[in-house]
C-alpha cells in the first residue's frame, strides 16, 4: 500500500477508503478480490488517473529567516499554497494538489531548509455525475 486515506461519508455509519497501490492488472485484481471477500466492504471502485480527480495535501515546515521569508511566500503563491502558521524562524505551508505538484513544491523549498513535512496520501473521486454508493 502506497497510501491509505479514510473518512466518514454523508452516512455516519459508513467510511470511505482510498487505497493507493502500485502493480500490474493481476496484482490489482487480486487486491480487489480479497477486499470484496470482506463482509464490511460495500463496494469497490478502481479510479483511473485520467478519469478521476486525485489530490494530496501536505504540511511543510520551512526555515524562514530574513530575506528568505519573502521568497518562500512568493514560491507558495505560485503553487497556490497557503502559509498556515508563522513562527519567528519558520513557517508552515499547506499545499493541495497532484502528487507531482506537491513534490515540486517540496523540492523548491528544500534549499531554505525543510524542518519537517507530512503528507496525507492521495484521495480520489471519479469525474462526472456518477457517484459511488
Task: Give short role names for the model-derived ranges.
Residues 1-16, 20-133:
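Long, contiguous binding/interaction regions
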Amino acid at each position: 500500500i502506497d497510501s491509505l486515506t479514510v473518512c466518514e461519508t454523508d452516512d455516519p455509519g459508513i467510511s470511505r477508503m482510498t487505497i493507493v497501490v502500485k502493480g500490474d492488472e493481476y496484482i490489482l485484481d487480486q487486491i480487489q478480490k480479497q477486499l470484496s471477500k470482506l463482509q464490511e466492504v460495500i463496494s469497490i471502485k478502481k479510479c483511473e488517473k485520467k478519469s478521476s480527480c486525485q489530490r494530496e495535501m501536505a504540511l511543510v515546515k520551512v526555515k524562514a529567516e530574513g530575506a528568505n521569508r519573502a521568497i518562500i511566500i512568493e514560491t507558495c503563491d505560485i503553487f497556490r499554497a497557503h502559509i498556515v502558521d508563522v513562527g519567528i524562524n519558520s513557517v508552515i505551508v499547506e499545499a493541495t494538489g497532484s502528487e507531482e505538484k506537491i513534490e515540486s513544491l517540496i523540492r523548491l523549498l528544500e534549499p531554505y531548509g525543510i524542518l519537517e513535512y507530512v503528507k496525507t496520501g492521495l484521495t480520489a473521486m471519479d469525474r462526472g455525475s456518477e457517484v459511488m454508493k
